[in-house]
Amino acid sequence: MDSIELIPGLPGPGRRLLQLLKDLPSNPSVIVREIPDAIDAFRESITPATRPSCLGLLDTILSCFELPIPTEPIMKALGKLLEPMSWADLKKFGIESYLVTGLEHPSTDVEIFCLHLIRRANWEKKEIGEPLFEAIMACINSRSIAVSEEATVLLFDMADFPYYFNLIIKRFTFVDYEIMNSTLRVRWLTLFAKLSTKSPEYLEELIKDDKLVINGDNKDILLQINFVDVLGIMLEAPFTYEYISSEKTKYLDTIAQDYKGSADSYTDHIGLKFLPRLCELHPDAINSLDEKHQLFDAVRERMKTNDATSILLYGVFLSNTVVTQALIKKYGIEDEANRYVPRWLTRRFLMDEPGMSSFAHALLQPDHNLWMQLWRILPPNTLSTLVNTASSPIPRSRQLAYQCLLHIAQNSPIQIASEGFAIRHLLEAEGDHETCLLRFQVLKTMMESPHGGPKLPFGRYREDILKRLQQGPIVSGASTLKVAAETA
């Protein structure tokens, strides 16, 4: 739509809405209850043919936000009214001033609606003026987490263009940090950490301008958690990782030293969020932290205290080839009590949710020789325990058991193919929908595995397996509804 020309011909619902608003002062308690339905009727009357005349009510619809009525019908009407309009069209109606007001509205839905509408602007052409941009920045401080998160994503995307990145730098000063509470500091630090990953130049500017204030020496738990999250964000780009891992900043050393302290929500966050991601992206750094700070020993000591976080983390370590090789080098494979996977841990793998979650991670090991090394030291009843757990009444336990069975089917399907009880379980037709899908997926994965596939010795079960794979996961006539009803 290149231009909007207001023409006569407003539909009847539009005229009725205007009349209701005109009569509102005479009987407000009655008329105000009719307005939401009138707005809905007006929305239904908007068509490509009537839209030009309906746009004459834009001011009127926007004024309805001031009434004590639900905001949903107003936003739906606005959404349909403005749907095909470009930012240039919207600017002809003075949309920026409306949006500045809308971003201060007490309704979260209205604020988010306005933030979404701003995405129609061409940021490369600098179509967002400074007053509106400042209103977007103010949304970071909103009482609504949803509004703050939406504004953060919007500013992050706009900062692809240096003009808006520089506006953020210009409008935010170090003094702002000094007067902010912990919640707001967390929001702004998170935004600046994300912006730092866009380019080395942005990182340099944020550091030079005291925007990226990363401080690991905090007593406030919110800031402690945010310290971990900020470093986690900066793992993602090579240049930000180089910065946080340098000898100058020593942030990784701080993380490792803090993790060795007492178990609390801060160190749990390190073990659950930061170290697994570091292991995935930069496994050599994990080994380096062990050489400098005996990180592996610290994790194993925490595991002995039944610490679920460290048990999960160790499974992540075992899923990485580089880290697993370092564990074997340090602890060996012979001493059952102290080897790289202690005997007690192999039993814990099969006991509870943290143990089985850790086991599922460990079975992701991509190196086949290391995968088989792990399998050889597992308890003899590992497969039977997994099959039994796959029938557990607890949904999460079933899911984890099948997750492990899927990894086994992919990496060493002979372990399942050689056990009749396991094949019989996978061929069962009854069960809830999810269970039937998972059984089918394990069978399918076995047949497609590069470690045997169709050549596996299925014996008398071969025809049944092929038939099931042709039928699909849900067998016609199987009593899945009964089980599903019992589960519900």
UniProtKB/Swiss-Prot annotation:
GO terms for molecular function: protein folding chaperone. It is found in: Cytoplasm; Nucleus. One of its GO terms (biological process) is proteasome regulatory particle assembly. SUPFAM superfamilies: ARM repeat (SSF48371). Pfam families: Proteasom_PSMB. Keywords: Cytoplasm, Nucleus. Its main location: cytoplasm. It comes from the Eukaryota. It comes from Schizosaccharomyces pombe (strain 972 / ATCC 24843) (Fission yeast). This is Uncharacterized protein C18.17c. The keyword Transit peptide does not apply. The keyword Nucleus applies. One of its GO terms (cellular component) is nucleus.
